Regions:
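Short intracellular "coupling" helices and adjacent cytoplasmic loop segments at the cytosolic face
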Residues: 13-23, 119, 127-151, 155-157, ...
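Membrane-integrated ABC transporters
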Residues: 1-60, 75-96, 110-114, 118, ...
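An intracellular "coupling" helix at the cytosolic face of ABC transporter transmembrane type-1 domains
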Residues: 40-43, 138-139, 155-164, 168, ...
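Juxtamembrane helix-loop junctions of ABC transporter transmembrane domains
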Residues: 20-28, 52, 59-75, 90, ...
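Transmembrane helices of ABC transporter permease
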Residues: 41, 45-58, 166-220, 293-306
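Hydrophobic alpha-helical transmembrane segments of ABC transporter permease domains
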Residues: 32, 51, 106, 110, ...
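ABC-type nucleotide-binding domain
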Residues: 82, 365-642
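Helix-loop-helix
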Residues: 77, 184-198, 268, 272-343, ...
Length: 642
C-alpha cells in the first residue's frame, strides 16, 4: 500500500462519485449529449423510428375521426331504413381495419428498431467508459470507491435503457399525437377544444408540481444506490477481515443503514411518481365527462353544427389527447432518473485522462554491420530509447537500466510533501533496497519511477533521459513490477503468466515459471498450466499467487524490476524457494526492492533507509550494521522477532 496517500474527500454524492445534483439548467445539456451519442451511430434508424411514430399516431387519429363518419354517414342513416344494406358499412370497416393494421405494424417496427438502437448505444457508452477508465490516472482509483465506479457501468447505464427504449420514443409519439389530435379537435369543434385545453392546463400544472418533488428523490435514489454498491464491494473484498474480527453484526448494521436510506429515497421517489398517472387519469376522466355533457347539449341545441357523430369522434380524440399528456408526466420521472445517471456517467467520462507529454519511445534494437544501434521489428533482447529531435533526426540510446533521483520532492496533496530532497541512483545491474517503518515513503518512491504520480520538484532520469520525456506506456513496458497485493485474473495459470507479455510462447511462460520456482506447484495443480483461476486466484495460497506474480514479471523480461514487498506474505520455506529464483531474475537488472524481512535484502548493493519521507542512511548491509543507526535497530529487531 502506498504510504501517506492523499486523504480521500468524498463529495455529497455516493462516496466520491456524486458531486452536485443535476440542475434543471443542466438537463437540456445532458439530454443533448445523450442524443448526440445516439445520432452519431444510429441517425438513419432514428429517422425510420420517427416515420413509424408519425404513421402510428396518424393511424390512431384517423381511426378516431372515422367514428364521426361511422355514426353520421352509416349508422344513423341505416336506422332510418327499413331494409338497410350492410355492404357500405362493411367496406368502411375494412378500410379502418387496414388503418389499424398499418398503425400496429408501424408500432411493432418502431419497438424493434428502438431495442437495437438502445442496446447498441448502451454498448457504445460502456466501451467509451471502459476505454476512458483505462486512461485515467492511478490517483482517480485511489480516491474513488471501486464499487461506486461499478455502479456507473451497471445502474447508471441501465437508467438510460428505459429512457432510450421507452421514454424518448413515447415523448416523441405523444408530441406528434397531441399536435395531430389538437388539429383534429379544432376542426370538429373549437368550443369543445377550449374546454379540453382548460383541463389539460390543470393536468400539466399538477404533473409539474409532482415531478418537481419526485425528481430530487430520484437523484437521491441513484446516489444512495451507488453507496450501497460501494459498500457491498468493499465488504466482499474484506470478508476475511470481517470474519477474523467477528464484525459481521457491525457490517450488517452499516449495510442496513445504507439500505434504509436507499429504501427511503426510492419510496419517496416512487410515491410521487406513482400518483402522477392516477391524478392525470382522473383529471382526464373529468375532462371526458365535461366534454360529453357540453357536446350533448350542443348537439341537442344545434350549436356549431355539432352532430352525434361529432360528439363521439371528439370524445375519442379527447381520450387520445389526455393519454399522451399522462404518459408525458410518467415518462418525465424516468427521464429525470436517467439524467441523474447520465450526470454520473458523463462526470466519469469528463475526468481528465492521465497526462502524457512523452515522446521518447522504447523499441527493439540490434547492431548493424557498422556496430550502430538500429531499430528492428524482431525481438532481439536488446532495447533502445528512440529519441526524435526537432531537426527531424532520430537517435537511439541503448536501454541500460540506469535510474537517478535528483533533489526529488513529492506530495499526494499540493500542500503536503511526503518525500523530501530524495537523491539516489540505481546503476545497471544493481539491487537497491528500501527499508523503513510504515509510511516512510518506500512504495511512494516506486510509484514515482513508473509515473503513477508525478513529482513536484527535482528530476528523475532513466538512462540520462528525464522520465517525463518518456512516453508512459513505454516507460512502464521497461519495468517489471511485483506489487504488494498480488492480483490475478480469471483465466488459466498460463494466461496469467502470459499477461506479463502477451506474445510470449508457452515455452517462455514455463521458463519464467521455472525461474520463479513456480513450476513445481503448478504441475501439481489439477490441470497444470491449464488450471482455471477464479476470484483473484482464490483457489491458490498467498505464496502461490505471489510466485505467479513473480513469474509474470519474469516473462516480461524487463531491464528494471520493482519488487514491492514481494516476499513479505510468503512463509519462510517458500521464501527460500523464491529467493533463489529471484536472485536469478534480478541478475543483470536494476532492481528496486522493498521488504519487511530484512534478510531478503541483505545482499543488496545499496540499502536506502527512509524515515518520514527522507533518506537518513544508505550503504550496504555491513556498512549500515557498523553504523549502528536506524538500519541496525530495524535489523536486530527483525532478528529478535525471528
Amino acid at each position: 500500500m502506498a504510504e501517506q496517500k492523499a486523504k480521500v474527500v468524498h463529495g455529497p454524492g455516493p462516496r466520491g462519485m456524486g458531486g452536485p445534483r443535476p440542475k434543471v439548467e443542466n438537463s437540456g445539456r445532458l439530454l443533448k449529449r445523450i442524443m448526440a451519442e445516439v445520432f452519431q451511430h444510429y441517425l438513419p434508424h432514428c429517422i425510420l423510428v420517427l416515420i413509424c411514430i408519425v404513421v402510428s399516431a396518424l393511424a390512431n387519429v384517423q381511426a378516431s375521426l372515422f367514428l364521426q363518419t361511422l355514426i353520421d354517414d352509416y349508422i344513423i342513416p341505416m336506422t332510418q331504413q327499413q331494409d338497410p344494406s350492410f355492404a357500405p358499412l362493411a367496406g368502411a370497416l375494412m378500410r379502418v381495419g387496414c388503418i389499424y393494421v398499418v398503425g400496429i405494424l408501424a408500432a411493432w417496427l418502431n419497438a424493434r428498431i428502438m431495442v437495437n438502437v438502445t442496446q447498441g448505444t448502451l454498448r457504445n457508452l460502456r466501451v467509451q467508459l471502459f476505454t476512458h477508465m483505462e486512461s485515467l490516472p492511478i490517483r482517480y482509483f485511489d480516491t474513488h470507491p471501486h464499487g461506486d465506479i461499478m455502479s456507473v457501468y451497471t445502474n447508471d447505464v441501465d437508467t438510460l435503457r428505459q429512457m432510450l427504449s421507452q421514454s424518448i420514443p413515447q415523448l416523441v409519439s405523444s408530441a406528434i399525437t397531441i399536435v395531430s389530435v389538437f388539429a383534429s379537435m379544432c376542426m370538429l369543434s373549437w368550443q369543445l377544444t377550449i374546454v379540453t385545453m382548460l383541463m389539460v392546463a390543470l393536468m400539466m400544472f399538477c404533473s409539474k408540481k409532482i415531478t418537481q418533488q419526485s425528481g430530487k428523490f430520484f437523484i437521491a435514489q441513484q446516489r444512495d444506490l451507488g453507496k450501497v454498491n460501494g459498500y457491498i464491494e468493499e465488504m466482499m473484498e474484506g470478508q476475511k477481515v470481517v470474519k477474523v474480527f467477528t464484525h459481521e453484526q457491525k457490517t450488517l448494521e452499516g449495510f442496513r443503514e445504507l439500505n434504509d436510506k436507499l429504501k427511503d429515497s426510492a419510496k419517496q421517489a416512487n410515491s410521487f411518481a406513482n400518483i402522477i398517472m392516477p391524478v392525470t387519469a382522473q383529471l382526464g376522466n373529468i375532462s371526458y365527462a365535461i366534454c360529453a355533457l357540453a357536446g350533448a347539449a350542443m348537439a341537442v341545441s344545434g350549436v356549431g353544427s355539432v352532430t352525434l357523430g361529432t360528439v363521439m369522434a371528439f370524445l375519442a380524440l379527447n381520450k387520445s389527447f389526455n393519454m399522451p399528456i399522462s404518459q408525458v408526466s410518467m415518462q418525465a420521472n424516468s427521464i429525470i432518473m436517467a439524467l441523474a445517471g447520465a450526470e454520473r456517467i458523463f462526470k466519469m467520462m469528463d475526468e481528465p485522462s492521465e497526462a502524457d507529454e512523452g515522446y521518447v519511445t522504447l523499441v527493439n534494437a540490434k547492431y548493424d554491420k557498422d556496430d550502430t544501434l538500429v531499430e528492428t521489428s524482431e525481438r532481439t533482447g536488446i532495447w533502445a530509447w528512440k529519441h526524435p529531435h526537432h531537426d527531424g533526426t532520430t537517435t537511439y540510446h541503448k536501454l541500460e537500466g540506469d535510474i537517478t533521483f535528483t533533489d526529488v520532492d513529492f506530495g499526494y496533496l499540493p500542500d503536503k510533501t511526503v518525500l523530501h530532497d530524495i537523491n539516489l541512483y540505481g546503476r545497471p545491474g544493481q539491487k537497491i533496497a528500501f527499508v523503513g517503518s510504515t509510511g516512510a515513503g518506500k512504495t511512494t518512491i516506486t510509484n514515482l519511477i513508473n509515473r503513477f504520480y508525478d513529482i513536484q520538484d527535482g528530476k528523475i532520469r532513466y538512462d540520462g533521459i528525464n522520465i517525463q520525456k518518456i512516453r508512459k506506456s513505454d516507460l512502464r513496458r521497461s519495468l517489471g513490477i511485483v506489487l504488494q497485493d498480488t492480483h490475478l485474473f480469471t483465466g488459466t495459470v498460463m494466461e496469467n503468466i502470459r499477461y506479463g507479455r502477451l506474445d510470449a510462447s508457452d515455452e517462455e511462460c514455463i521458463a519464467a515459471a521455472r525461474l520463479a520456482n513456480a513450476d513445481g506447484f503448478i504441475k501439481r495443480l489439477p490441470d497444470g498450466y491449464n488450471t482455471m483461476l477464479t476470484g483473484d486466484g482464490a483457489n491458490l495460497s498467498q505464496g502461490q499467487r505471489q510466485l505467479l506474480a513473480i513469474a509474470r514479471a519474469a516473462v516480461a523480461d524487463p531491464p528494471v524490476l520493482i519488487l514491492d514487498e514481494a516476499t513479505s506474505s510468503i512463509d519462510t520455506r517458500t521464501e527460500a524457494l523464491v529467493q533463489r529464483g529471484m536472485d536469478g531474475l534480478m541478475y543483470g537488472r536494476t532492481s528496486f526492492v522493498i521488504a519487511h524481512r530484512l534478510s531478503t535484502v541483505r545482499n543488496a548493493d545499496c540499502i536506502v533507509v527512509l524515515e518520514q519521507g527522507r533518506i537518513i542512511e544508505r550503504g550496504n548491509h555491513d556498512e549500515l550494521i557498523a553504523k549502528k543507526g536506524k538500519y541496525y535497530q530495524l535489523y536486530t529487531g527483525n532478528l529478535a522477532e525471528n
